[in-house]
């Protein structure tokens, strides 16, 4: 952000949503939600310090419940936007639909549209006492954009809808200068956006996309001339026609070598230290704890397989979290231990379950040690791996046939 601000007096900093919660946070158990809530508040406070000016409400942002999201909104020094998220009972809006931001003498109007194809049950679960609905994004755009256009110089639409819907909006509603499309792909979440998909000219509207999960920061540098629509890209035309506004769009990678901001890291370290605290008295019972054998039990008979396992990355999975101080984060730990939330919760009970062990891959089979003939282990299934090795978790493709060979134990010698 400092690099983006350096050549400019000011920037307009916007977020495309699905920021505060992850896609699986709605499945979190009660004891996990407190930490996930603190993580969401950490993100909001970080955004406050970075100077964000608005954030679209994405459908993942309500997975911990509307009440928690509204607590975060009260903390924020910037508006949460969604023109089409409404209460079902009276059709009133839950969040502000628009905002106008002053940016270097220009007024930037921002309209937020949440993806409008989310199932009704998901919205009801987010606020059971007063269920939510999502109206059609294109209808809200048609209703609100003419008035917003009269209040601003540049009009930006934050729309977490499908590319097809965003194209329909651009074609049907004149006056939109920029659509920021967070590229939502339900069922097949895509983290990296190909270069040819990062920009799209839709008549007089420019649609831009950047990568998910904070992988890259999209920056749109506009040299605005009143009446100079449509804008011309300097990457294609170094000598644009007179009187036309110009833009330059690029995505800056969030590389590991970038210096960490001490103020933000102070917030992160405080969160990490607090993540190790678990109220023992408030923990639920763990009725399935006795079903877990752990690798120590398996090692008594399967010596060769245990020796092989110790040389794999699975055997050091917990240590990789310790290196970053994230070992007690509830959104990380489950993929680095055995049986989190089923066999143990409290840190002081974690020792036998650390690392990715036999049962992470093979499943539970508590009767095997006493009667291996009648309780054999089945083959490892790809679905066991995909619980953790998916793009939401790792940002990379997982090829089961290739990766399995790296961790597959030597075959047993049968008598």
Regions found by a protein language model. Give the residues of each.
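Acidic, metal/ion-coordinating pockets
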Residues: 1-251
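Short sequence/structural segments immediately N-terminal
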Residues: 60-61, 229-232, 236-415
């Amino acid at each position: 952000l400092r690099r983006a601000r350096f050549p400019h007096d000011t920037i307009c900093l916007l977020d495309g949503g699905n920021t505060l919660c992850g896609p699986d946070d709605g499945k979190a158990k009660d004891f996990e939600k407190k930490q996930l809530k603190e993580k969401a508040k950490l993100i909001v406070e970080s955004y406050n310090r970075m100077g964000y000016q608005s954030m679209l409400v994405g459908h993942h942002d309500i997975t911990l419940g509307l009440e928690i999201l509204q607590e975060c909104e009260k903390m924020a020094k910037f508006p949460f936007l969604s023109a089409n998220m409404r209460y079902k009972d009276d059709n009133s809006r839950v969040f502000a639909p628009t905002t106008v931001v002053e940016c270097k003498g220009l007024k930037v109007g921002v309209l937020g549209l949440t993806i409008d194809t989310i199932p009704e049950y998901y919205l009801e679960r987010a606020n059971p006492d007063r269920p939510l609905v999502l109206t059609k994004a294109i209808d809200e755009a048609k209703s609100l954009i003419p008035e917003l256009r009269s209040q601003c110089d540049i009009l930006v639409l934050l729309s977490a809808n499908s590319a097809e819907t965003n194209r329909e909006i651009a074609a049907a509603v004149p006056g939109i200068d920029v659509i920021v499309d967070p590229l939502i792909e339900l069922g097949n979440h895509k983290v990296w956006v190909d270069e040819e998909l990062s920009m799209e000219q839709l008549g007089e509207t420019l649609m831009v996309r950047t990568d998910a999960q904070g992988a890259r920061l999209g920056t749109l540098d506009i040299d605005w001339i009143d009446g100079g629509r449509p804008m011309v890209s300097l990457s294609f035309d170094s000598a644009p026609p007179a009187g036309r506004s110009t833009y330059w769009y690029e995505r800056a990678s969030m590389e590991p070598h970038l210096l960490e901001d001490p103020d933000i890291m102070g917030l992160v370290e405080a969160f990490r230290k607090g993540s190790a605290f678990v109220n023992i008295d408030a923990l639920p019972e763990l009725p399935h704890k006795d079903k877990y054998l752990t690798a120590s039990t398996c090692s008594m008979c399967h010596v060769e397989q245990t020796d092989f396992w110790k040389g794999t990355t699975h055997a050091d999975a917990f240590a990789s979290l310790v290196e970053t101080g994230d070992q007690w984060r509830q959104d990380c730990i489950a993929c680095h231990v055995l049986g989190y939330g089923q066999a143990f919760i409290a840190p002081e009970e974690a020792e036998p379950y650390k690392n990715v062990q036999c049962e992470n891959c093979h499943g539970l089979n508590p009767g095997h040690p006493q009667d291996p003939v009648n309780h054999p282990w089945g083959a490892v299934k790809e679905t066991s791996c995909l619980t953790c090795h998916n793009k939401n978790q790792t940002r990379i493709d997982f090829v089961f046939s290739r990766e399995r060979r790296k961790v597959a134990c030597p075959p047993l010698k049968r008598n």
